[in-house]
């Protein structure tokens, strides 16, 4: 298939592109910079959607970038980097004479309200209680297409675990030094997915015509607490992981974003499993062993 990927040059996009090309799909990227096998967002806006069978959007500024202060300017970048690119792709799909077979968007489990007791599947309510849940609601609304000529899929991703990027890249040094541990109380849930499975779900969604609607992009064993995750990462590295990161430190560094680390959701991939997708890394121990190998 001919696949157009928005934001395909980052940590997740690189893994997705590599898998798709390995499966024999022809991939073209939409990015800010021109280059071979790419079009720019401005070219997409001016010329419309190139001929393709599937469109995937992964674009979005990294919310947890520790080098950026959580101020009004950065909040606007977080919003516009997601909403504008999604609006643009959805508009291009709507206006083209040859619409793609599928349109796939990756959002986040921040849609669901943090809780120490509730369990969320794809039909659970959410999306209207803080900046991040409202962001996901607006993001998914921006992607909706009129009619049914194009199959629409939304993957709400958990924390993505993989080599060379993502959340775990910031954790490895202190954990390797034996200075790692739970964040805050450690009781909060930590919904996770191996990057190979997130890419795998996207590939499965574009190849399997019966897949549509919302899928939770988390591992079956992602009902893990932050403390359990810290212990598992320490074990994978052969290091102790008992030194907690105080919530005051997390709030000082991340501001309002700290809620994403200090609170969590128990999310299950009920509909994802029902589609028939087979996880490569359903369990945390094997996922971390692969990541730190």
Curated annotation (Swiss-Prot):
UniProt EC number: 1.1.1.-
Keyword NADP: yes
Residue stretches in coiled coil: none
Residues annotated to bind NADP(+): 31-32, 58-59, 77, 82, 160
InterPro entries assigned to the protein according to its UniProt record, in alphabetical order: DUF1731 (IPR013549), Epimerase_deHydtase (IPR001509), NAD(P)-bd_dom_sf (IPR036291), SDR39U1 (IPR010099)
GO MF terms held by the record: oxidoreductase activity
Pfam families in the cross-refs: DUF1731, Epimerase
Superkingdom of source: Eukaryota
Protein keywords: NADP, Oxidoreductase
NADP listed as a keyword: yes
NCBIfam families found in the cross-reference section: yfcH
Purpose: Putative NADP-dependent oxidoreductase.
Family, as annotated: Belongs to the NAD(P)-dependent epimerase/dehydratase family. SDR39U1 subfamily.
Stored PANTHER family: EPIMERASE FAMILY PROTEIN SDR39U1 (PTHR11092:SF0), SUGAR NUCLEOTIDE EPIMERASE RELATED (PTHR11092)
Protein name according to UniProt: Epimerase family protein SDR39U1
Origin organism lineage: Eukaryota, Metazoa, Chordata, Craniata, Vertebrata
């Amino acid at each position: 298939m001919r696949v157009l990927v928005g934001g395909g040059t980052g940590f997740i996009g690189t893994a997705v592109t590599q898998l798709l090309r390995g499966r024999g799909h022809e991939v073209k990227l939409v990015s800010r910079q021109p280059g071979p096998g790419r079009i720019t967002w401005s070219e997409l806006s001016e010329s419309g959607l190139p001929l393709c069978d599937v469109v995937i959007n992964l674009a979005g500024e990294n919310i947890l970038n520790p080098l950026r202060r959580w101020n009004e300017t950065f909040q606007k970048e977080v919003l516009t980097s997601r909403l504008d690119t999604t609006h643009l792709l959805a508009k291009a799909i709507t206006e083209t004479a040859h619409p793609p077979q599928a349109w796939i968007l990756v959002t986040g489990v921040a849609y669901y309200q943090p809780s120490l007791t509730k369990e969320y599947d794809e039909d659970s309510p959410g999306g209207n209680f803080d900046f991040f849940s409202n962001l996901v609601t607006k993001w998914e609304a921006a992607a909706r297409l009129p009619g049914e000529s194009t199959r629409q899929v939304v993957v709400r991703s958990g924390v993505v675990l993989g080599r060379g990027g993502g959340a775990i890249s910031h954790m490895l040094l202190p954990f390797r030094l034996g200075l790692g541990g739970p964040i805050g109380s450690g009781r909060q849930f930590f919904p996770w997915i191996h990057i190979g499975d997130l890419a795998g779900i996207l590939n499965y969604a574009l190849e399997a015509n019966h897949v549509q609607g919302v899928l939770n992009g988390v591992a079956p064993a992602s009902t893990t607490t932050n403390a359990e995750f810290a212990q598992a990462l320490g074990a994978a590295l052969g290091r102790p992981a008992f030194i907690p990161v105080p919530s005051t430190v997390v709030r000082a560094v991340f501001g309002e974003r700290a809620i994403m680390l200090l609170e969590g959701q128990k999310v299950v991939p009920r509909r994802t499993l029902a589609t028939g997708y087979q996880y490569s890394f359903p369990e945390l121990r094997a996922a971390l062993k692969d990541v730190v190998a």
